[in-house]
Every structure is written in C-alpha cells, then in structure tokens.
Amino acid sequence: MAVFTTVSQDEIARWLLDFNLGEVRELRGIASGIENSNFFLTTEHDGQTRQYVLTIFERLTFAQLPYYLHLMAHLAERGIRVPAPIPARDGEILRPLKGKPATIVTRLPGASQLAPDAQHCAEVGDMLARMHLAGQDYPRQQPNLRSLPWWRQTEPEILPFLDAGQRALLQQEIAHQAAFFASTDYAGLGSGPCHCDLFRDNALFEEDGSGRHRLGGFFDFYFAGNDKWLFDVAVTVNDWCIDLASGELDPARTQALLRAYHAVRPLTATEAAHWQDMLRAGALRFWVSRLWDFYLPREADMLQPHDPTHFERILRRRIGADPASAPLPWI
C-alpha cells in the first residue's frame, strides 16, 4: 500500500455522507505497498468508534474492480476472515473519490507477523486451502493479470536495465514457463479464485490471550484472479517459508504450511510433480513486477519500492534445486 492520491479529512467527511458510518475521527495514510492509495479510517457513529480501510485505486478501473470486491464479500460470507466491503446507502460498494474508484472495507484485527514460525505457516496453509474451496462457486471470472501474458508484455520494457546474465535468466525462465503453461499437466491442475499476493504483510495475527497468535485474516486482494491453486500456494511459500537472506526454503515451515493445506484440500500427484515449476513461476512473477516498479516507478507520497534482487535470488535458488539430489520440501 502507499499514498499516490492525497485526500483531506474534510474531503472524506463530505464523501462519507453517502454512507451510514457516522463522523470522521481520524484519517491516516498507510505507507506499505506500491499499488493503491490506502488509509486507516476511524469513524464514530451513535457513540461507537469503528475502524476501516479506505482504498483509492490508482490502476484498476471501475470495470475491473467488481471482481475483487465481490470476491472479498463472497469469501467473508462463507466464513473466511477477509475484509468485507462496506456498501453505501444505495447499496454500491464502489464510488468515485477525486476522480478515481474508491471503496471502504472492514479493518481486520491484529498485526503482520514478519518472522513467522511453523505454527504461523500452518495457520496460513489451512486458511488458504479453505479460501480456495470457498471460492469454487464464485461466479465472476478474471484471469490473474500478472501471469504469463503480462511477463511477456513487460519483458522488453525491463530488459534494457539488466546485465547480460540477468537478461539471459529472464528470457530463459519465461520460455520455460511458457512451455509449462502449454502442457497437458498444467491444463489439468486445479484452479479457481486465488489471492496471488499472499505475503507476510498481507495477513494479520492477533494474540489469543494465552500468548499464542491466531490468524486474523488475509487482506489486499487487488492482485487476485482465477489461476492454478498451486501457483497461489507457491507464491505464499516463497515468502512465508524462506530464509530472507538466502532465499532458501525452510523445511519445517514449508512442510507445516503444505501439510495444513493438504489436510483441507488434498494436493495431487501432478501438483507434486510440478511443485518446482510453480515455485519458479511464483518467483518469476515477483522478480518481473519488482523490476518494473523499481526501474519504471510512479510518483507517490510514501512510496517504498521493493528491491528486485530479492526475487532474482529466490528464482536462481529454485532453478538450481535438483529434485533428485536435494528434493524441495513437500508434504
């Protein structure tokens, strides 16, 4: 999250007249992330203070956004702990603000767990599987917009910034993934709505009173799309289950996440066979996007672009893993 579009408390107070949320008590920009303008919003209504998240969308359009917002509502209605969009008085969950689409969602409890252990990863795996199953009857369709077609489209824009070794890595890995995506095995993998960006900072944990942490929920669904469930798992594992310095997978955390996921939605033999391919796909997706954001940035207050070398390192690790001599952690 970031702040590209600034907005005053008075402007929000006028905008909120279309909602039944009461009076604005605080509006505070959120610095993390790089896609939309996000704010913590506190209101008071009938003597009660409530907290929300206001998002102004910088890239997504009014036509694109219903997929994401209605997916969040769909999952929340089925007991998955995700932010629920708040409708205005006319029932709409998307309204213009400063000429851009904007929405208000409930604020989840807790804080991000940036140094997760195996138990945190198990909770994430369990909820991710339940989220995948809960989304099976979601009627709207939209592909993951940051998948192979986007990698190919972005490749010529970022190649000039890379050295010879990086250019070769990018071109060879896109070719590898194109062949994988065209395969019969890939076509047969289970699919449905996926988060596609489930990093440590997109989940919240709260203390349960006994010193343990309970998963408060997943948020930031604005990269979601219909994709292979295994891709969603790989993206998640590539962040939650690694040593940040080296990019290596931690076996205990990886197996905790995968086993918890498998207990809810059993993973198949075909998914096991292509686990390394999907880990590579997940690493490639974020290497490409971080290169793009780093070298072709947009202006924004509080913008904090991520270092692209992190996912380059992860991708090289995944490519270099030899399943015969050093199998990647699995269930």
From Swiss-Prot:
- Catalysis: reaction(s): L-homoserine + ATP = O-phospho-L-homoserine + ADP + H(+)
Q: What is its EC number?
A: 2.7.1.39
- GO process annotations (BP): threonine biosynthetic process
Signal peptide residues on this chain, from the entry's feature table: none
Nucleotide-binding in keyword set:
yes
Q: Which GO terms describe its molecular function?
A: ATP binding; homoserine kinase activity
Please give the superkingdom of this protein's source. Answer: Bacteria
Pathway membership: Amino-acid biosynthesis; L-threonine biosynthesis; L-threonine from L-aspartate: step 4/5
Keywords for this entry?
Amino-acid biosynthesis, ATP-binding, Kinase, Nucleotide-binding, Threonine biosynthesis, Transferase
Do you know which Pfam families this protein is assigned to? APH
Membership in a protein family: Belongs to the pseudomonas-type ThrB family.
Q: Which NCBIfam families match?
A: PRK05231.1 (NF003558), thrB_alt (TIGR00938)
Please identify the protein, giving its name as recorded.
Homoserine kinase
The organism encoding this protein is: Cupriavidus necator (strain ATCC 17699 / DSM 428 / KCTC 22496 / NCIMB 10442 / H16 / Stanier 337) (Ralstonia eutropha)
What gene is this protein translated from? Answer: thrB
